[in-house]
């Protein structure tokens, strides 16, 4: 059943992740299969300690049209509304989460990682929030 879902994630576009390590690991575990057909399933099967959809503390392929990896910080079912906001990480956050992102790319550039909080109706694709946005709620009144 569809409902509103709220997530707070650390998001990076797949184009900024060197997928060589991930793809080689999948090829070793599934040598005769076309993993491109269902990339998410192969990720979750080959890396069960790292990837699992909608699981706090794990990566997921974002439920968006554009290809992102999300590291899930918070996930809540039966949330309210549709919104999204994003910002760049500050230096201390980039340092804190670097070891986690190095699990998917040892040479990851944390400058491409964004903190994204969004809520959407999960009967549809989630919006592609990534670029820094300013929430008008914080504008001076």
Locations of the language-model features?
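Charged interaction segments
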Residues: 50-141
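Charge-rich, solvent-exposed alpha-helical interaction surfaces
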Residues: 21-25, 29, 38, 42, ...
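Short, extreme N-terminal segment that most often corresponds to the first beta-strand
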Residues: 1-38, 116-125, 137-141
């Amino acid at each position: 059943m569809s409902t509103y879902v709220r997530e707070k994630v650390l998001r990076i576009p797949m184009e900024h992740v060197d997928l060589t390590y991930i793809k080689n690991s999948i090829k070793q575990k599934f040598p005769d299969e076309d993993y491109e057909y269902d990339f998410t399933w192969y990720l979750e099967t080959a890396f069960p300690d790292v990837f699992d959809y909608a699981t706090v503390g794990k990566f997921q392929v974002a439920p968006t049209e554009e290809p992102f990896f999300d590291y899930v910080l918070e996930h809540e079912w039966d949330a309210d509304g549709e919104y999204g906001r994003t910002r760049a990480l500050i230096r201390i956050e980039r340092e804190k989460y670097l070891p986690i992102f190095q699990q998917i790319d040892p040479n990851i550039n944390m400058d491409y990682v964004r903190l994204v909080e969004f809520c959407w109706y999960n009967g549809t694709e989630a919006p592609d929030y990534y670029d820094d946005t300013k929430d008008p709620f914080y504008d001076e009144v």
